[in-house]
Amino acid sequence: MTKGILGRKIGMTQVFGENGDLIPVTVVEAGQNVVLQKKTEEVDGYNAIQVGFEDKQAYKKDSKSNKYANKPAEGHAKKAGTAPKRFIREFKNINVDEYEVGQEVSVDTFEAGDIIDVTGVSKGKGFQGNIKRHGHARGPMAHGSHFHRAPGSVGMASDASKVFKGHKMPGRMGGNTVTVQNLEVVQIDAENNVILVKGNVPGPKKGLVEIKTSIKKGNK
């Protein structure tokens, strides 16, 4: 069954494996995960748990700041006997009998060697051209060429007389939800609520990441 936890990306470092190989790892701090709600097939049509991560300040009247929880969020968290949470996610296809509302989920849910999928929001790159954004090839840089990094033709002259939807063009790059699949858990540090994941994961330092059992290899 699926297992899941929320955390923040701390950065990257290196560790040595048992055979002496140097392994690049991403350090993820995943503490303060609390089960806010259980969803069952009988009531909701599917099995899932709702997990909250990082405390948010209690409701403050007339405040429009995001650092304060609103009344519905505060009431929802109170049912679980915890403070309102900044990030809330659902993990489906999970054995709900193993969890209770208000229970803390720690990093030792996973073990070294587990295969996982990690979801995060990719780094924003700003407005970029076709070459960087879509990997298009550039034109010649010499011999009288007038075509270097321009996108080229984007549509027909008279027959269609328009640019079709979905055409790859310059624009805002990054800031998308990205999932990297089939990463390996290298090490668990339960005392410091830290998971070491082999390779890189999406997002900047201090970015929120969602770690769950691999959808392709985790249940085999």
Curated annotation (Swiss-Prot):
One family from Pfam that matches here is Ribosomal_L3
Q: Quote the InterPro entries the UniProt record gives.
A: Ribosomal_uL3, Ribosomal_uL3_bac/org-type, Ribosomal_uL3_CS, Transl_B-barrel_sf
Show the GO MF annotations.
Answer: rRNA binding; structural constituent of ribosome
Name a GO CC annotation attached to this entry: cytosolic large ribosomal subunit
- Keyword annotations: Ribonucleoprotein, Ribosomal protein, RNA-binding, rRNA-binding
Task: Report the superkingdom from the record.
Answer: Bacteria
The Gene Ontology biological process terms listed for this entry are: translation
Q: Say what the protein does.
A: One of the primary rRNA binding proteins, it binds directly near the 3'-end of the 23S rRNA, where it nucleates assembly of the 50S subunit.
Record HAMAP family: Ribosomal_uL3_B
Known partners and oligomeric status: Part of the 50S ribosomal subunit. Forms a cluster with proteins L14 and L19.
NCBIfam families cross-referenced by the UniProt entry: L3_bact (TIGR03625)
Concerning its family, UniProt says:
Belongs to the universal ribosomal protein uL3 family.
Protein name in UniProt: Large ribosomal subunit protein uL3
